From Swiss-Prot:
The keyword Nucleotide-binding applies. This is CTD kinase subunit alpha. The active site is at residue 399. It comes from Schizosaccharomyces pombe (strain 972 / ATCC 24843) (Fission yeast). It catalyses: [DNA-directed RNA polymerase] + ATP = phospho-[DNA-directed RNA polymerase] + ADP + H(+). PROSITE patterns: PROTEIN_KINASE_ATP, PROTEIN_KINASE_DOM, PROTEIN_KINASE_ST. GO terms for molecular function: ATP binding; cyclin binding; cyclin-dependent protein serine/threonine kinase activity; RNA polymerase II CTD heptapeptide repeat kinase activity; RNA polymerase II CTD heptapeptide repeat S2 kinase activity. InterPro entries: CDK, Kinase-like_dom_sf, Prot_kinase_dom, Protein_kinase_ATP_BS, Ser/Thr_kinase_AS. Residues 139-152, 198-215 have a biased composition (Low complexity). Belongs to the protein kinase superfamily. CMGC Ser/Thr protein kinase family. CDC2/CDKX subfamily. The modification Phosphoserine is found at residues 56, 58, 104, 109. ATP binds at residues 283-291, 306.
Amino acid sequence: MSYSKSTIYRRQGTEPNSHFRRTVEEKSQLSGTNEESLGGHTLSSNAFKNNSSSISPSSSAKDPREQRKRTFPLNDTHSSRARQHERPFRSRKSRRRKGKKAFSPRPGSPPSPSFYRSGSQKRARNLTTKDYFAKRSESSSSASVSPISPSANRNDSKRQASSFRRSPPSSVHMKPSAFNGRKVSRRPSSSPPPIPSIPHETTSSDTQKKSSVSSGFPENKHGKFHFHIPNERRSRFDQPPSKRMALTSTARESVPAPLPSPPSGPIYTYTYPKPAYEKIDQIGEGTYGKVYKAINTVTGDLVALKRIRLEQEKDGFPITTVREVKILQRLRHKNIVRLLEIMVEKSSVYMVFEYMDHDLTGVLLNSQLHFTPGNIKHLSKQIFEALAYLHHRGVLHRDIKGSNILLNNNGDLKFADFGLARFNTSSKSANYTNRVITLWFRPPELLLGETAYDTAVDIWSAGCIVMELFTGKPFFQGRDEISQLEVIYDMMGTPDVHSWPEVKNLPWYELLKPVEEKKSRFVETFKEILSPAAIDLCQKLLALNPFCRPSAHETLMHEYFTSESPPPEPAVILKNMQGSWHEWESKKRKSKR
């Protein structure tokens, strides 16, 4: 038994959308009178042609199922809702398809890209766009007056309600500006204008990927506004424009100015209309360089310029100067000279210090000046206060001598020249050099080759300075290391294993061991010159055994500073001295005589 193709389609439910291909006459011949359930009346098909409705009572009362069969034609496979609202046909296969439903555009709005991609265009290929929306407008107008049958589902009611939504305002196009000919639409006047920003260089990918943001409206989504931008092809690869793109009509067409070129010289350079410092006179000289008295041309303050020569340094910047700068930057004390700044020239480096009028050696070379016991006590106290601070910070000066102790006219004392200073590791395995400290102020352990020493070496040098204040001249004056040891042994006695057990372990002890033992004659020599407290203090400071020497803090607690009279008194007599007295200047004056 053979069936026609139309019959097979009807049985399988896959007949093409033939409703839109047949004319009205063919429909009436196949289905007869179109009956609509409108309160028990029938509506003839001619009523649509004459635009007038003829309502008559139903001629026969039959079974409801028979009436429904007569109401809808047998050769029409789509549902009553599809026929009533004249919407495109959806097959059973498409109904079972999962995912979002294809969007059906409402009257007055052109179809969106999703409409063309969903296949709805194929199902309505027999209709032009004008006819399609004409039928949609008729169906929507009829839906507003016709009752909704109980069989209507929620999706149908939502589609009807969506037809009454307000259409979005049309976009306002602008003239092409600085965006490579792109049409930029501005937002409606109701919304605040966006902040203009610097336009960026667009690429070919930016031109191809355009979105709804460029036209001033939100991005297309199913169930929301769908509109068409003339002369622009919308695609699913829409991307928002760059955040720096301006969306207002006030966008400037000018290209931003290029960045300025980097300067040819250093970025941070300080220049002055005149030299920052003017040299007045030379006040010192040594192996490192020269020291000048200078004036600050801006503030008028006196400073000391320590010039470091670099032309003779084959290995670069002197390590002693590096240590001095590093240590002075960490020290802040009233009895330590202050480093103001560092100035660099082509072949030299200047270290700028605060200016002090004298140094201790230059003052003691002046035969007309004599310190009182109160002045000596005040100066000695300042020496140990500075040492207590240095040792507390873990710094060994290692070059305490008269020329490195500065004085001003008010009697203030400050330590200077930290070129040989270093941080103390406080370790028994420390290995320092013993070629430090000027020979006259060098302790006996260094003269015997000790390399693991501590703060006791500075205490010995300070004891020599105190004795120099009492006597007015250096206390131990030797020609070399051997003669220096002999001078020390003559005054303080020779060391032995009982008084200094560690002396036998020193490298040069056996080599420089004295032939005969000598006893100390320090007390007998100074018992008529110094007070008992001063003798006791100096004898402890100049002990041969470094472990028997007191610390700087213990020295300040000695009765010489705490209870013995006279009390410490500032050396104001320095104000009566004419000019500045430094060691280099004092020796220069003597040579002229």
